[in-house]
Each structure stands twice: as structure tokens, then as C-alpha cells.
Amino acid sequence: MTKMTSIIGILMGVLTTATAASIPTGSSAAAAAALGSLGVSPPSGNVLIGNAGYTCSLLNRVLSKNETFTVTSPYYDVLIDEAWSENCRLNASCIVTPESAEEVSRLLQILSILETRFAIRSGGHNTNPGFSSIGSDGVLIALEKLDSISLSADRGTVTVGPGNKWESVYKYLQPYNLTALGGREAVVGVGGYILGETGGLSTFYNTHGLAIDSVTRFQVVLPNGTIVDATPTEHADLYKGLKGGLNNFGIVTEYDLTTNTGVDIYYEIKTYTTANTPAVLAAYATYLLDADINSNVEIQINPSYTLVFYGYLGHVSAPTDFDPFSDIPVASTMYPPTNGSLTELLLSIGSTGLTSEGVSYSGTFSFKVTGSTFLQDTYSTYLEAAASLPTGAVLSYVPQGVIPNLVTQGKSQNGGNLLGLDATPQVWANIFVQFPATLSQSEVAGSVDSLLANLISSAKSEDLFLPYIFVNDAGAKQKPLQSFGEKNIKYIDTVAKRYDPKRIMQRLQNQAYFVLEEL
């Protein structure tokens, strides 16, 4: 899941213990026979089950040398360090970098036969340790070589591999004057952004809806090795399940995305002082209650200042949608009012990325926007929490405003999604902290958890709380699948049973939001 992957964020420069213990170790003649059916000859002696070291030695023999990396490989540390957050740089027993869906198929079958734990990584921007990383007891499947991009003959869809970063997709589409719904930070990976994070917010998400709703085809490798296409008409149940069900079904190796014409946009970026931030939030609430679907305002609050991005689709001058903010004194202008290309904007500020040094931790909750002062009131609660953190820990608050059009877009495209969203003006609030690894992770994380609990309690007391948990920003302890509603989570479980009857993705995959744990 991508944390703070917004325009303004860029500028800022589980398996339970019991489940893990259930994975067997020992030897198995049946496993040897199953490997033989794949044309894989295990070393002489017993076949070890649930032993990552043994599995890695076998993979090193079966796959080409440039696809399997152990701790002694020169490229191993480089691959580990691609994880964005320092606390996610876990030392896997080995790292495998498949180059095709067929290789992913072979790999998944071997891991399933040998009952070996694994994690899947696209761009590595997840801040929850173990969600796209794994320690010495498992194999890391790094999808970076699945980086193909191709445009359909009618230019209506672009086929993208999960190993791409959005920067590559934007650059590929730019000569055609096209774009796709993708990360607001260009260095975020495609796979985690779309699938592992249930949706993905693009720069104009309120106009077009979530990125997951723009997917017209998923190529999926099921745990038994079968490669299938999931579309509205082919494996339609799996297609619908993937639009909310995360990585509970298999490994997605291709996405077909609807393209959009690369129209000009109006944008400007300003900063405001802490004294004026309550006024900014009051204006934001007013804006969200009557927002033009072609406009977008993004806010990132930091302890010493607040950043605001103003955007509008089309070549315009000073859109009136931003009038609620016009009388608030501006501390500085980072980008003056500009008419230009969305792609150029994303590439120009996204190439810098966010710092990857230090540890990251986050959480999220949702609430309705009404005529109340709740949004402004959250600011004082946030400031108190930020001031209580130890030196070096920087707490950010990102209230991501969502208008009803995002919800209706999701329901109208290709059969809808499984997120269970309410069509009401709302905020998906992200609380995000970065801090040096020398600080106590439990202390800092505990402060964030306490802040979230206080904000949720306040929202409930004012009857503004919404159950939806935006997976992109969710913490490891949160249960987003439950927030989709009972009907939707049961549907996800039904589809998971159908396509993964042995529950490989939930028994062997390292930490994630598993449907079995949230039912």
C-alpha cells in the first residue's frame, strides 16, 4: 500500500503465530512425486517441507541464475533495499524475480508443493513489515521484471505489468497524449497500487473514480499454476472479487487499464501556516459539500505548515471552485497558477519521490463531511499528538476528501467493486509518521494508534464515523475487508475458496489482509 502517495506528499521530499506454526516441516514422498510431475528433480535425500533454505536451493537449480538471489548474491542487498520503508527491508531466505506469467506459475506450484512461505512485492512502497516482505523463513517474489507495457490497437486500453513504476507508464503513454489512472507519486509500483491497496487514488480520483475501477482485465496466476484472464465476461466472479479482494486469490501478472486523453489541467500549490490551517480545513469542508467533479483539492498537514494542491481538469483560469480558500493568507507559493499537462506535472514532482530513510507507520479512518466543525476539530487533536512524539518523529495528517461521484463511478464501471462505499461527501483520513530506526517503534506506533482511536471515538460521538478503511493507508492491525460489509467479504471468501481451495494465498503468503482472518 502506498503511504502519502499524493501530489503534496511527493513534495514532502498476517499470518498469526498459530498459523505460521502450522506450516509443516520434515520430508514428503508425495512432494517429491509432485515435483517430478513438474519435471523438477529434487536433490537426493529427503524433500524438506516448509524449509525456506531448502526451497531456495531448489529454486536456484530450477530457475535461471539471474532470477534467484540468496544472501551471498551481489544483487541481494540492492533488491532488499528497494523496499521504501526501512522497517520493511527484511532479509528473505532468497529473492526470486520471475520474468513471465509462466515462470510465476512454476514458482507458485513449487512453493505450494513445498509448503514454503512467501511474500509478493511490486514496487515495495508498503509500510507494513511483512506485507510485501518476508524474513529468513520465506521467499520474496519480486515482480520487477514483469514490466511490459503495450497499447491496444484502438488505444483504448494499456496493458501493464505489475513490476512497472507509474513513471514508466506515464512516459510510455505521453507521446500518444494519453494517460491512465495511476499513482500520484510516479515511483509507486503498479501492482501494489491497484490490487494490494484496493483501488488507488489518482490525481483526479473524484472525477474518474478509483484506479481499480479502470481495470478491464486481470491476468492471474492461480496457486495451482493455472493462468487465467479475469474480465467482466470471463471468470467474471474472479474479476469482481479482485475489485476489492486484494491478493487473496493468486498473483496478478497483467492489468488492462482504460486510457484517458491527456487533457491540460490547471494547478497551483500553496503552503499555509499552522495558525491558518483551521481556516483551510473549514474551507475544505465547504468545498467538499459542493465540489465540481472536475476539480481536486489535496491537503497535507504537518506540524509546522500545511500544503494544499489545487487542480482542475481543463485549460482554465482561476476556477471558482477554490473560492472558499481565496481569503486565507498564503505563506508561500510552491507552484504558481499554471496550465499544463498532468503527465508533465506528475513526472516533474514525482521524480524526486519521498525519502526512504527511516521507519514508517500509518493508519486510517473515514468520516462524513457535514456542516459541522469536526474536520477543523481534528487538527487540534493531531497537533497534540504530534507534539508528544519524540524528537525525530514527524507526524503528518492527510484528510483525503471524497465526493459522491467517486462512488457512483465505481458502481457504474464494469459491474462495480466490493468496497461498500457510501455515496456521501467524506474524508479518508491518513495519519502517517516517519522516524529514525533508533527510536522505539512500539512507542511511536502506540502514539499513532492512540491518536486514531481518539479521532474515531470523536467521529462516532458526533455520528460522523464511516466504517470504510482505505487499504492504501491502513495499518497492519486494521481489518479493511471487514469494512466492506458482510455481503462483500462473504463474496470474497466464496471466490477465494473457488480459485484457491487449498488456501495457499492465505496459509503460505506472509502477512496481508486475509479474508479468513477477517470473516
From Swiss-Prot:
EC numbers for this chain: 1.-.-.-
| Pathway linked to the protein | Secondary metabolite biosynthesis; terpenoid biosynthesis
Q: Name one GO molecular function term.
A: FAD binding
**Signal peptide range:** 1-20
Instruction: Tell me which Gene Ontology terms the entry assigns under biological process.
Output: terpenoid biosynthetic process
InterPro entries reported in the protein's UniProt record? FAD-bd_PCMH, FAD-bd_PCMH-like_sf, FAD-bd_PCMH_sub2, FAD-linked_Oxidoreductase, Oxid_FAD_bind_N
Which residue pairs form cystines in this protein?
none
Q: Which Gene3D superfamilies match?
A: 3.30.465.10
Pfam families xrefs: FAD_binding_4 (PF01565)
What are the record keywords, sorted? FAD, Flavoprotein, Oxidoreductase, Signal
- Remarks, miscellaneous: The macrophorins cluster contains a single gene insertion (encoding for the terpene cyclase macJ) compared with the yanuthone cluster that produces the linear compound yanuthone.
The record's function comment reads: FAD-dependent monooxygenase; part of the gene cluster that mediates the biosynthesis of macrophorins, isoprenoid epoxycyclohexenones containing cyclized drimane moieties. The first step of the pathway is the synthesis of 6-methylsalicylic acid (6-MSA) by the polyketide synthase macA. 6-MSA is then converted to m-cresol by the decarboxylase macB. The cytochrome P450 monooxygenase macC then catalyzes the oxidation of m-cresol to toluquinol.
Name of the protein this chain belongs to: FAD-dependent monooxygenase macF
Provenance organism: Penicillium terrestre
Gene this protein is translated from: macF
